[in-house]
Amino acid sequence: MEQSVSARWLKRYRAFFLILLLIVAIQLFLAYKSLDIVGGGSGSGFDAAEAPASPPPPHAQARVQPPARTKLTAQQLGFQPECDILAREAISALQRAKTKDCREHIAQIACAIQAGRFYAPQLRSSCPAGNHTANVSLGCFKDEKDRRLLAGYYSSSKTSNSPAKCVELCLQSGYPYAGVQYGRECFCGYDPPPKASKLPDSSCNTKCLGNAKEICGGFYAMNIYETGIAKFTAQLAATTPSEETKRVRIAFLLTLNGRALRQVHRLLKALYAPEHVYYIHVDERQDYLYRKLLELESKFPNIRLARKRFSTIWGGASLLTMLLQCMEDLLQSNWHWDFVINLSESDFPVKTLDKLVDFLSANPGRNFVKGHGRETQKFIQKQGLDKTFVECDTHMWRIGDRKLPAGIQVDGGSDWVALSRPFVGYVTHPREDDELLQALLKLFRHTLLPAESFFHTVLRNTKHCTSYVDNNLHVTNWKRKQGCKCQYKHVVDWCGCSPNDFKPEDWPRLQATEQKSLFFARKFEPVINQAVLLQLEEWLYGPYTSEYANLHGYWQSLYHHEDVHGSGDDLARSIGDSVMRLSARQAKLYPLELIELTHYLHRDQYKGFLVRYRARGSTGKPLHLETRVRPTQQGKLARNARFSKRLRNFEVSTDFDQKEQIARNFGKLLGPQSDLLLSYTLQANADSGAASHSYNLTLLWIDPLGRLQDFNELHVEDSTSDVINHSKTLLKHPITPGIWTAKLIGRNSIYAQLKFLIAPLAYYKGYPLAKSSDAEALNAGLTVALPEDFEMPVEWQQHLQTDDEQFTMREESLAKGKMLGQELHSWIDGLVGQFFQLRESCVVEADSEVSLPLCSDAPWSSLAPDPKSDVDALLK
């Protein structure tokens, strides 16, 4: 009877028993896995989004092996490497590197690492350690689950734990004490264990999983060792100097890139004083900025430009090389200075120069760097410090894992620093017998973002450790969700983060610096937002007068005829020349030479680009003119669709900045080599009580021949706030020149349509097109991106031309694609005239032959007064 009842119960509740059994099994599995934690912090407040990337932990990486190794041949590489390269990442880098020199460089380093003769395995810190001695055992101590003896850091390893390895790990992380427990566990801490917790040595009796001949604590029993370093405490900076304190002089090291000349002038105006030094490094590729800033040397005896220039890429080792070279140049100069502060064109002061000088004068000999503020082991992994990187071909190649040298503390954070002259002299002139500094220089020359860790690590491990102040004098506008989009994958084998530009809505962050020892903020870009800069300047220096000329205007060069021309200028010159011809024709002039293209913004609204050129009138006299041009794209939105009514800024462009949520091709210059994308803003649903909708849409990319070249499937969700979206194409280059159409369609309707121009090119690699074969290769554009076997949905056919129409247009496109000279110019002018509106013109010098205003009187002109960026005002 009992068996019968039991059977009935089991039968009736079988499903519940099975679920209960499954839950128990899952709990047991999770309990087992919890013992295998690789490493964890102890409430350090670490924010995973703050670091440049999220690679797997090093122990996990060591266990992952590629399924099969690819062997590279000398024929593939173009040379015979000195070893059979084994590292999977090195092989990948060699396969992707474009030049033989780069491949040889990668192979040389990979072989040296493989042979164990590249990195120093052990280094010795010279920072005073007090009475601490590495690997000295303090004994066995009783631990508690809720009150850990060493609560700084914890890791667990089933295969490699030992006292020596735990000591090495804790020392690297900056902890004076290391403890092993339960065979597999390693703990780190700042404070010595209390004597009351001492246990007999026999209580620690568990063998180490990494070395069975050694003991690694026991059950809540911990063997504790000294790591050989003292507890590190950053110096507290003084805030005000004494009356007898000598005022310091500062060397401002400006490391510049891009074409924001007026913003650089504005920064110099805010920082300038005759007693300080301004040393400027301009990226080797930025010919325009270097040429324009070179003019300052003859006007200001304390402004100099570096003659030895580097091409610095995001995360590149060349950045550290450049900084050290510039610092060495400053040391070798005749200038007297006490501190060097590195800044970029994106920095701006949040306090006056006098306040900065007062602060540094109160802290002579100290070094200001900002630490990562999180657990060191996680910082190492997130920063990629446990990887080897090689820079060549303007790319940072990851070529494999590495073990950092034992015996030193690893530190890092921001690469914006304020360093004292003695420390700068130390790092730029390493003695041959200084093994520590020599090894660190070699280590960080093959490190991602080296300037973010080099100065910190050198400070922590040398006699200069007592000068370390955990403050780099900067406030940075981090918005992790926007700034960490892997936007640098094209130049580095890693995911990177960048801070956002300050905007007026970020003003409270800037105001909050008033009572803090913060003197600079970043980033600022007037091409994105100038209003916040004006607000900051008025906060520091008082309000501008109402008569101040062109206060809300901003100009930034796009092209200049004196630049070293390359293929990067072909499109701008082709369109610029066309606008010049159209403008000159309108004024009944003969065009001579395109001089400059300049972006113009007013109150942070893009007003078009300015075309400055020379022309000749009927009398033969040369004239100098400028025309404002407004790019247009011809869009239509469905009138009756609720979705269409909420679409804004529906446009095709290139260079979409996910961080700032904007396409940086402001002039809408699109050509056969452009990587197209469509961006749009979907406004929030005005009816907050309405049901939320989602939309499944298709974006069709239709070329001038009426062919479908690509399509994107879009899934759009309603949102309570405005949302900016973008969608990229996968078109094959060269793209067919002419008038393209982007159509956003649903199942039965068209929501939006946009016609935009792909301009033909009149230049090839910096020179006017002279061969029909070159012209055809660039401008015929007969390739189709979609595969031949692609089955076109029937409902899409209505949006395309028929086969006969496509054939006719193809023949016309082929004929136009071979055009040269005047024929080519006429074709380009006919297209440019439809998509670029000539708004207004001016003349540089008055002339009776043209009835145009003077450019100096036209507030939009690049030649109009701009006193906020007039660096010559410093001479008055």
Curated annotation (Swiss-Prot):
Residues 134-228 form the WSC domain. The chain crosses the membrane at residues 15-35. Glycans are attached at residues 131, 135, 342, 696, 725. It catalyses: UDP-alpha-D-xylose + L-seryl-[protein] = 3-O-(beta-D-xylosyl)-L-seryl-[protein] + UDP + H(+). The keyword rRNA-binding does not apply. It is a single-pass type II membrane protein. Pathway: Glycan metabolism; chondroitin sulfate biosynthesis; Glycan metabolism; heparan sulfate biosynthesis. Its EC number is 2.4.2.26. One of its GO terms (biological process) is chondroitin sulfate proteoglycan biosynthetic process. It is an enzyme of class 2 (transferase). It comes from the Eukaryota. GO terms for cellular component: endoplasmic reticulum membrane; Golgi membrane; membrane. Divalent metal cations. Calcium or manganese or magnesium. Residues 36-876 are lumenal. GO terms for molecular function: metal ion binding; protein xylosyltransferase activity. Pfam families: Branch (PF02485), WSC (PF01822), Xylo_C (PF12529). Residues 48-67 are annotated as: Disordered. Its cofactor is Ca(2+); Mn(2+); Mg(2+). Belongs to the glycosyltransferase 14 family. XylT subfamily. This is Xylosyltransferase oxt. It comes from Drosophila melanogaster.
